[in-house]
Amino acid sequence: MEDNKELQCLICKYSDTDDLVFGEWMIVRNLQVHYFCLLLSTHLPQRGGDSSGILGFLLRDIREEAAAAEKRKCWYCNKIGASLQCDRCRSLFHLKCGLENRAVFEFCGQYKSYCYKCRPMDDYKRQLQSNPPRNATCPICFSSIYKVELHCVVYGDCCRLGFAHKKCMRQYALTSGYYLRCIWCRSERFRDSIRLQSVFVPDRDATWEKQRNAYRELHERNLKCDQPNCLCPSGRTYNRLSWVILCCSSCAATSAHLKCLVGALRLPKKRERTDFKCSMCLDVERRIAEGPARTTEETNADGDNQVDGSFYVQKLGPDAATRSLTQTPVFSEEDESERSSNITVIFSQPKSNATSERLSLSPPQEEMIVEIPDSPEASPKTSIDENHSPQPIARRDTSDSPQPIAASEIPDSPQPTAASEIPDLPQTTAINVNPELTQQTALNTIPHSPQPEASFSTQLVSQTFDCPQPQEQAVAKAPNSPSLPKEDPNTLLVLKSGFQCPGEPFFYLVIYEFEHGTCMGECIGTCVLRFKEDDPRIQDTSQAALERVNITPDDVWCRSEDRGIFEHIEKFHEWYRSEGFS
């Protein structure tokens, strides 16, 4: 009991221990939850098999639901950790608060919950509520039921012949398992109807079938002929001379005279039979051979785990694909699941800004015209048209001046910092590039050092100027930038944000993830890393230091499909291609 007092459910935050109303404690990898909190949590899907996570509930999903429950307040106690939601009024509450306030739980299908006001009612229930019967007796504990109320008693919907305490019925159902029958009419439909009355029925053998020496009588030799028609004149127990009694070679619980077997099976007298199998064992062997293959592996091999696999039941819904993503930090490890994946070290782009993009420039043509048309209103989209045919532009006489230099060297050219910051132009602007300078001119060169400005830049010019410099020096120069780092820039992390939760001794770092583990691939989402406050790797929380943090698989807390700014960049590229630009 002292160990149970130290336990706290990760979902509901309560430490109550009652197997009948909260279910057994499920403990895996220091994760402790009530089993009924797993089943009845409205937004927690069961995406694994009986050997995955905790009876089909993946550890990642459990921690994700626990983190989401910390944002929900209970309708009754006004505390966080509410994971159950009324299927009709959508009010949230704890499992414990629901039990105390007469909520109804369905332990089948989608495992729905209902508050007291929204509980399902039919004509029979309304009749019991308006005119409750008197002098009822519980057939399990043989105690009187002082008042028949639906939240404290159950009844057999198959026959409606009596009532029983809900607590007694929970113990009876937990003990009986497959063998649960209606205690009034012995109907098998009772198992399905009782699950709608807040009673959990496990799909397993009865507990008395698993007790020590439960089948002791099967190991005792029963030297008595069990054939329907015993032919021995001295009786069924006679075991001498030619009337030898043989035991079943499988169970040893059934025996028969050899002569009785020969007569019953119509075997030839010359054939001497030394063993036989009773009809019950033959039927069991036949069903095992025809049934599906079963595995004898344990659910959890770790000795520290505490999970009873016999409690496994299947839960339908909610659909995991439609669940809302959350940025709340949760564990991401997944236990023996088809959906689990290896943790990959994330590499980053060389840009410190997450919005940076590389532009691949096509080989220069003889004449390249870049036109940016008028835009009536500010827009983050940019139209660029490449025309390979020369077009005349207005210019003054430049017979005595050298050829025009590269656009990036013109001192008065505006240089916006982002695609969304391109100002409205009063007229169409064209850049005429001299083919003699194509081998020496670099347009829109993006340095390979971190830039705090934009994803890309465009140099604009409306006319040419006299340039006294020699033509050999007309080479585009990159803007001033810090010296290149010595390490490979692809090893840097692409940061999104960093934060701390009040009351938690942890620091959370959100980074972007890319396909194939490199920033050259497509962004696939974000990853939340969790570090302790005293971790020496995050003592320096500057951007440059966080980009160079060496992460391990244990640092991964959760993942999300939110791609942030990369989602907008991809939409811009799709629009750009849809307009016919290349």
Swiss-Prot record:
Residues 383-399 have a biased composition (Basic and acidic residues). A zinc finger (C2HC pre-PHD-type) spans 6-44. Keywords: Metal-binding, Zinc, Zinc-finger. SMART domains: PHD. One of its GO terms (cellular component) is nucleus. GO terms for molecular function: zinc ion binding. InterPro entries: EPHD, PHD-type_Zinc_Finger, Znf_FYVE_PHD, Znf_PHD, Znf_RING/FYVE/PHD. SUPFAM superfamilies: FYVE/PHD zinc finger. One of its GO terms (biological process) is intestinal stem cell homeostasis. Transmembrane segments: none annotated. Residues 340-363 have a biased composition (Polar residues). This is Pineapple eye protein. It comes from Drosophila melanogaster (Fruit fly).
